[in-house]
């Protein structure tokens, strides 16, 4: 992240050139993560996605046995979904953690902050937007699939073992994964690699200079910390219409995944008389949708790659908007259409597969929309992408934390049909944001003080 405050112009001050010891020897320097072999880079990406997946299903696994756990502790969900508070606490922490972890990863390296955040790794390994598309798509899928598959895993454990094994199994996986992460994960932050190499190769006389450089690189005041990691994302959220509306869209997409962990239990238990652990298996339909959404994202990546080619007739100034093409059907048909379908097929007289198809559509929409928003914010905001993404990330986790708390009341008081329709109408309104940007994005970016420096020049 930059050093400007949110109220300042996004012009960066000219920084002094680093000493030779803190530069790559040439563009082919083998220690530069951009030059690592593809197998090594993709190994790191695969490990990052794996960690994201297992941490994600940790958030929602408890939902698969919420009723039994509530009965054990004497917690009632009759008037309020108190059993969802563990998930709310997890997602609230996920909203706050990036503001702490990202500075650690940027200043001290990836390894110290790796167990708490992985999405920043992709930018360290892939230098251009085209090659970055696929790993980011994989990252978004691992995030969504992890939180969606949680109730399925929890339901299976509850059916065949005891609900406490939901937590025991997670401890086993985390303890088993930590040595692998510690041994396999390599540092990917270029400045940190250079600093370590300089210290390794420096003479005794040079060690003092290196220590001073290291101290300068790792120093940031609490005021600077707040400005860069809290004030600027918040400032962009309330002053940048693109960040504001895209945060709402991606937050709703993410929140719907968590709402389903509550609504599916209500719908399928009441309409079809299924036991709790069986209703949890329905969440697998959303994972199927997310996988189909990943395939659509691969096609979207192809469209961007084609537009990025030198012979393409797409103006370079319009490249960020190419990222949004598939988000239009993803939001209109996937999110809004899937919610309408899910709601208005929730009748006892209809086969259970019909509302399940609606859930699959919402999975497609969530995957396509979240990937498009992440890529657009990265490309359009360039060096301010971290702040824009932090705002969107906070919004996603806040919606995921608190929107499901209203699910029980909504689906009880409004009925299954209109509760889903309320969310569908909100999604329908927000679905126009990508259309506006596709037609007027270049003009909007010129008006924005943060986006005025185009990502592609």
Where are these regions (language model features)?
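Pair of pore-lining "gating" transmembrane helices in MFS-fold secondary transporters
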Residues: 38-60, 238-259, 332, 340, ...
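C-terminal transmembrane bundle
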Residues: 56, 88-91, 95, 154-155, ...
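Cytosolic juxtamembrane N-terminal segment immediately preceding the first transmembrane helix
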Residues: 1-58, 62, 67, 71
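Cytoplasmic helix-loop-helix junction between adjacent transmembrane helices
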Residues: 114-143
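Conserved MFS/SLC helix-loop-helix module at the cytosolic interface between two early adjacent transmembrane helices
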Residues: 95-113
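Membrane-interface helix caps of multi-pass secondary transporters
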Residues: 61-77, 104, 121-122, 264-272, ...
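Central mid-sequence intracellular linker of multi-pass
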Residues: 2, 34-39, 123, 131, ...
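Extracellular/periplasmic helix-loop-helix junction of adjacent transmembrane segments
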Residues: 65-95, 138
């Amino acid at each position: 992240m930059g050093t400007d405050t949110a109220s300042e112009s996004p012009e960066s001050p000219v920084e002094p050139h680093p000493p030779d010891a803190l530069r790559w020897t040439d563009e082919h320097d083998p220690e530069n993560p951009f030059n690592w072999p593809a197998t090594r880079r993709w190994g790191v990406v695969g490990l990052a996605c794996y960690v994201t997946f297992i941490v994600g299903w940790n958030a929602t696994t408890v939902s698969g046995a919420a009723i039994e756990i509530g009965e054990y502790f004497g917690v009632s969900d009759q008037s309020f979904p108190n059993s969802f508070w563990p998930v709310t606490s997890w997602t609230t922490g996920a909203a706050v953690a990036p503001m702490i972890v990202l500075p650690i990863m940027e200043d001290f390296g990836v390894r110290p902050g790796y167990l708490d955040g992985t999405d920043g790794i992709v930018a360290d390994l892939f230098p251009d937007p085209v090659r970055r598309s696929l790993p980011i798509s994989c990252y978004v899928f691992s995030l969504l699939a992890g939180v969606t598959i949680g109730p399925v895993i929890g339901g299976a454990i509850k059916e065949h073992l005891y609900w406490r094994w939901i937590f025991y199994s997670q401890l086993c996986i985390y303890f088993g994964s930590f040595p692998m992460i510690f041994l396999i994960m390599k540092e990917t932050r270029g400045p940190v690699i250079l600093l370590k190499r300089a210290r390794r190769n420096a003479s005794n006389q040079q060690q003092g200079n290196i220590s001073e450089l290291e101290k300068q690189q790792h120093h940031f005041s609490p005021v600077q910390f707040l400005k860069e990691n809290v004030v600027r994302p918040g400032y962009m959220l309330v002053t940048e219409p693109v960040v504001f509306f895209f945060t709402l869209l991606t937050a709703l997409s993410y929140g719907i995944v968590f709402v389903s962990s509550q609504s599916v239990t209500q719908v399928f238990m009441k309409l079809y008389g299924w036991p709790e652990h069986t209703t949890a298996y329905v969440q697998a339909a959303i994972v199927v949708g997310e996988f189909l959404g990943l395939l659509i994202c691969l096609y979207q990546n192809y469209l961007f790659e084609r537009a990025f080619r030198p012979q393409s007739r797409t103006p370079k100034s319009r490249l960020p908007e190419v990222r949004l093409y598939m988000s239009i059907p993803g939001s209109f048909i996937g999110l809004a259409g899937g919610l309408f379908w899910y709601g208005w097929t929730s009748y006892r007289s209809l086969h259970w597969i019909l509302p399940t198809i609606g859930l699959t559509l919402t999975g497609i929409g969530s995957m396509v929309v979240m990937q498009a928003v992440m890529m657009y914010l990265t490309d359009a905001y360039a060096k301010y992408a971290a702040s824009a993404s932090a705002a969107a990330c906070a919004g996603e986790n806040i919606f995921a934390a608190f929107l499901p708390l209203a699910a029980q009341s909504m689906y009880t008081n409004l009925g299954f049909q209109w509760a889903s329709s309320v969310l569908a109408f909100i999604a329908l309104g927000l679905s126009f944001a990508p259309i506006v940007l596709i037609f007027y994005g270049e003009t909007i970016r010129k008006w924005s003080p943060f986006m005025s420096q185009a990502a592609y020049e």
